């Protein structure tokens, strides 16, 4: 037996893939002596050294071990409304839309869900949500996660929410530090210029036409809400000024003038049960989110309520929304165009269709003659796709969709070779690159193409090998030719085809399947958040600047398939994922491949304050081993004390 005064470690034999190998719970008395037993006889082989100490102390357990990364969060499946005929109907709406919208909020659950659904699902506009913080300082009704871990959970809930509203998600570096006494304090803690720079960067990147934000006064909620509103207001002019944050311009971004900016009216700007005919003050615009959409099978507010229910750690209602009046109110704050004080829509004065693109070539109509001609052709193909859409035979839209895709690609090539101004080229390319992605997805939906890259394991370690099975299916009577199939992985990973054939002709209802062997690089980076808490300021340090603003780092392994439909090539890209049955009620769960340490140690609590005379406290040590072969490991647990002052 190793006595408490003996510092010699004991070996710990780790069986393969043991998961949580051992949980050591020791009762600690203020004297430093384990209560009830002397020494360590646990088979886990952990040596603990206890020393006498001063009257009051802080006990910290220090382990030489790899920090346990954040656990992989479930990647939920797409909703049925994004698949089949309904998904194609949604996609065709996007093809004819040329405008974009962004909402700026302080925390997850501040957003106007019904409006996001209305603009994205109902009108096909590009929509985005810029949430300044990840909600790290909030409460958690589901589990023990707090602070940074809670921020990860709430970020994942936002991604689950966006399955309903279709919006893109962005974040700044701001840390949600909890209650604030003033806007000034919030700006000081976050760093005004740093967070304003993030907001400006995201606006310059996404280039929205209309931006809405939270109220800048007390009716908008807490100090974080008001601060976010003020920063968004300042970003209206800053994003358009090349002298503000010039380093972004040097990196390749260009200034962007938001056309109109609105502030929420009356707090959250959401009202239920009030008649849509009730008059509103001058300068206030009402959006009818209670309108019924037959494709969605409900109102925008109803689908928005389902989206909002994803904020489960914040105890959002799980009851489905009921049909009826639902509106959101917005006060015009700034505009780059002439406006009427009796607007009926946030996009009054802005073309929401493809003619929005014409605004980028004003004064260059002669040089842009080719573009104007191509744009008219594109609008015609979109119109024919709308006319030929048939829920029972969605592939009837393929001729129009393929023609539209070809026009977009030709326009992009012609713009590069044109004499248009650099600014015009930049903004047209920005919009048309998204349009090509939308046409690509629409063609795949019309064919009923399914790409399923499934890994045999969701958690892997450096140096390990795992299999990926890939299935490609054509669920329409229109044949396609699968020309290339590949896996894409980080540098240093090795990929090998191990069986099957996933290229060739794919007829009606046909499938192709194959297998790949993937070896993780010995020095592979662990899957973890790309942001890290800076404990000197309430702002995150960014570990990879290329990812700034994104919800999470991209999946490490992707499957990429190219197929030929008619005379156009279509490329599909899907993250390789692992599927499993969860321990709770529901359908299958999915997660992306996650790289974890082979050996992880977690101590709880990490810091313990235990005054003299206090009751015994429990210390828990969890060891997780992920490799397939057994190993011998030695773990030390030591006590560090310091006087209480």
Protein language model features and the residues they cover:
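Short terminal hydrophobic/aromatic SLiMs and anchors at protein ends
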Residues: 2, 14, 21, 30, ...
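Bacterial N-terminal signal peptides
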Residues: 58-69
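Active-site rim/loop-helix segments in enzyme catalytic domains that contact anionic ligands
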Residues: 75-205, 226, 230-237, 241, ...
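The feature marks non-catalytic terminal segments
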Residues: 238-443
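Low-complexity, acidic Ser/Thr/Pro/Gly-rich terminal tails and inter-domain linkers that flank the onset
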Residues: 415, 421-463, 579-614
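Asparagine-centered strand-capping/turn motif at beta-strand->loop junctions
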Residues: 472-476, 623-629
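Eukaryote-biased detector of low-complexity, proline/serine/threonine-rich segments
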Residues: 503-575
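Residue-level detector of conserved catalytic or cofactor/ligand-binding positions
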Residues: 632-643
């Amino acid at each position: 037996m190793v006595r408490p005064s003996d510092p010699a470690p004991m070996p710990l034999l780790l069986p393969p893939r043991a998961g949580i190998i051992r949980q050591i719970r020791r009762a600690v008395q203020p004297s430093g002596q384990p209560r009830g037993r002397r020494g360590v006889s646990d088979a886990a082989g952990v040596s603990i050294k206890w020393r006498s100490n001063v009257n009051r102390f802080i006990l910290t357990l220090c382990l030489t071990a790899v920090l346990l990364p954040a656990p992989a969060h479930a990647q939920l499946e797409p909703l049925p409304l994004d698949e089949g005929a309904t998904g194609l109907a949604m996609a065709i709406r996007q093809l004819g839309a040329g405008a974009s919208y962004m909402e700026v909020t302080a925390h997850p659950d501040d957003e106007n869900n019904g409006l996001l659904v209305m603009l994205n699902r109902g009108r096909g506009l590009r929509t985005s949500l810029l949430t300044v913080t990840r909600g790290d300082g909030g409460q958690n009704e589901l589990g023990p996660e707090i602070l940074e871990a809670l921020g990860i959970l709430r970020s994942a809930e936002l991604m689950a929410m966006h399955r309903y509203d279709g919006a893109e998600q962005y974040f700044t570096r701001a840390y949600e530090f909890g209650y604030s006494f003033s806007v000034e304090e919030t700006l000081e803690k976050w760093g005004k210029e740093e967070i304003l720079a993030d907001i400006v960067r995201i606006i310059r990147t996404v280039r929205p036409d209309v931006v809405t934000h939270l109220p800048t006064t007390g009716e908008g909620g807490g100090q974080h809400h008001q601060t976010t509103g003020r920063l968004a207001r300042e970003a209206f002019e800053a994003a358009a000024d090349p002298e503000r944050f010039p380093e972004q311009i040097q990196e390749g971004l260009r200034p962007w003038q938001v056309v109109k900016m609105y502030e929420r009216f009356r707090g959250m700007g959401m009202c239920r049960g009030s008649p849509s005919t009730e008059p509103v003050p001058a300068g206030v615009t009402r959006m009818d989110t209670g309108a019924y959409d037959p494709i969605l099978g409900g109102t925008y507010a109803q689908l928005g309520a389902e989206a909002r229910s994803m904020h489960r750690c914040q105890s959002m209602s799980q009851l489905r929304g009921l049909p009826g009046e639902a509106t959101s109110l917005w006060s015009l704050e700034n505009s780059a165009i002439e406006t009427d004080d009796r607007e009926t829509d946030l996009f009054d004065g802005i073309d929401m269709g493809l003619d929005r693109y014409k605004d980028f070539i004003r004064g260059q109509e002669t040089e842009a003659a080719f573009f104007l001609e191509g744009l008219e052709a594109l609008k015609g193909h979109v119109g024919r796709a709308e006319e030929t859409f048939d829920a029972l035979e969605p592939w009837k839209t393929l001729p129009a969709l393929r023609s539209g895709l070809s026009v977009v690609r030709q326009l992009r090539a012609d713009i590069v070779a044109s004499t248009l101004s650099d600014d015009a080229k930049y903004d047209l390319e920005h919009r048309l690159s998204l349009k090509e992605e939308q046409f690509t997805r629409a063609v795949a939906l019309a064919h009923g193409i399914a790409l399923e890259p499934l890994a045999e394991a969701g958690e892997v370690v450096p140096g390990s090998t795992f299999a990926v099975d890939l299935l490609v299916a054509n669920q329409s009577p229109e044949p396609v030719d699968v020309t290339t199939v590949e896996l894409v992985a980080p540098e240093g990973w090795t990929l090998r085809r191990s069986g099957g054939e996933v290229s060739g002709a794919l007829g009606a209802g046909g499938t192709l399947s194959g297998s790949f062997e993937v070896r993780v690089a010995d020095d592979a980076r662990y899957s973890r958040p790309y942001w890290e808490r800076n404990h000197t300021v309430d702002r995150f340090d960014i570990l990879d600047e290329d990812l700034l603003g994104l919800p999470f780092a991209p999946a490490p392994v992707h499957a990429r398939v190219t197929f030929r439909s008619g005379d156009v090539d279509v490329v599909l890209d899907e993250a390789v994922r692992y599927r499993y049955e969860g321990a709770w009620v529901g359908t299958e769960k999915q997660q992306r491949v996650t790289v974890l340490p082979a050996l992880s140690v977690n101590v709880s609590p990490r810091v313990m304050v235990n005054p003299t005379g206090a009751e015994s406290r429990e210390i828990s040590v969890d060891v997780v081993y992920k490799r397939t072969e057994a190993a011998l490991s030695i773990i030390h647990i030591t006590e560090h004390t310091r006087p209480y002052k």
